[in-house]
Curated annotation (Swiss-Prot):
Record-level GO cellular component terms: cytoplasm
Residues given in the record as a divalent metal cation binding sites: D13, D14, S44, N92
Cross-referenced InterPro entries: SurE, SurE-like_Pase/nucleotidase, SurE-like_sf
Cofactor field: a divalent metal cation
Record-given protein name: 5'-nucleotidase SurE
NCBIfam families, per the entry: surE
Cofactor note (record): Binds 1 divalent metal cation per subunit.
Record's keyword terms, sorted: Cytoplasm, Hydrolase, Metal-binding, Nucleotide-binding
Enzyme class: hydrolase
Gene Ontology molecular function terms on file: 5'-nucleotidase activity; metal ion binding; nucleotide binding
Pfam families: SurE
Source species: Halobacterium salinarum (strain ATCC 700922 / JCM 11081 / NRC-1) (Halobacterium halobium)
HAMAP family: SurE (MF_00060)
Functional summary from the UniProt entry: Nucleotidase that shows phosphatase activity on nucleoside 5'-monophosphates.
């Protein structure tokens, strides 16, 4: 351990036994001193859900927390490890693309939680085609995403990236998905297409964007995260922690009339 190296807190939402977080921790070990604090089991799509108390267990990677990704960030920052210079969440199995996932994804929400502490953060996910889902992934599958993350972690803090961005949302294509190796700066797509159908006492929710992506039928413009990843690029979206506020004259009038 080098006292001059940055302290890096690593977490995820797929759980501490997922290959993506092991690949990430191994890769970031070349950048700084890594402490892993991650959920004991899968916490995908939990957003920023928070617990009051969580059980913590030793794990060969670090600490396994019986809680959410947001729990892990708070526990890691305030109780379990050295205070980090950077929080990195991932590598998620599957992309986190578009504006609508930012509040839903546990991977991204861990980065947002860190941002509220004023700690720079990176959320990283690996986009997979529909036919790749359901197939087990291995540590080696995450190499491209980890390479992109370590590149950013080396320079982003010292180069002032986080002077204007609270966190980065990184999406890298699966190495078998025609990856170009190019990294591009993007903005989250505003596309949204959820629907639901009822059968008896059950309502099934459908994300039609994933169906469209599988068919190659997307209309996201150049410069968006989804377009970049489907074109084989690594997408990096610099973001600020929600929620932004703007002055509204009309709302002032309504409030005054109350």
């Amino acid at each position: 351990m080098d006292a001059d190296e940055p302290e890096i807190l690593v977490t995820n939402d797929d759980g501490i036994d997922a290959p993506g977080i092991r690949a990430l921790a191994d890769g970031l070990d070349a950048v700084g001193n890594v402490t892993v604090v991650a959920p004991a089991d899968n916490q995908s799509a939990t957003g920023r859900a928070m617990s009051q108390e969580v059980a913590v267990h030793d794990h060969d990677l670090g600490y396994a927390v019986e809680g959410t990704p947001a729990d892990c960030v708070v526990a890691g920052l305030e109780a379990l490890g050295p205070y980090p210079d950077l929080v990195v969440s991932g590598v998620n199995e599957g992309g986190n693309l578009g504006m609508y996932v930012l509040g839903r994804s546990g991977t991204v929400s861990a980065a947002v939680e860190a941002a509220f502490f004023g700690v720079p953060a990176i959320a990283v996910s690996m986009y997979m085609r529909e036919e790749q889902f359901g197939e087990p992934t291995a540590v080696a599958d995450y190499e491209h995403a980890v390479d992109a993350t370590t590149h950013l972690a080396h320079d982003a803090v010292t180069d002032g990236i986080f002077d204007t961005a609270d966190y980065l949302n990184v999406n890298a294509p699966h190495p078998d998905a025609d990856a170009t190796g190019e990294m591009v700066v993007t903005r989250p797509s505003h596309a949204y297409d959820m629907t639901a159908a009822q059968t008896g006492d059950t309502v099934t929710l459908y994300d039609r964007l994933w169906e469209a992506m599988a068919a190659g039928d997307i209309h996201d413009p150049d410069g968006t995260d989804r377009r970049a990843v489907l074109d084989g690029h690594v997408s990096v979206s610099p973001l600020t922690a929600p929620h932004s506020t703007e002055h509204h004259d009309a709302l002032d009038g309504i409030a005054t009339e109350f």
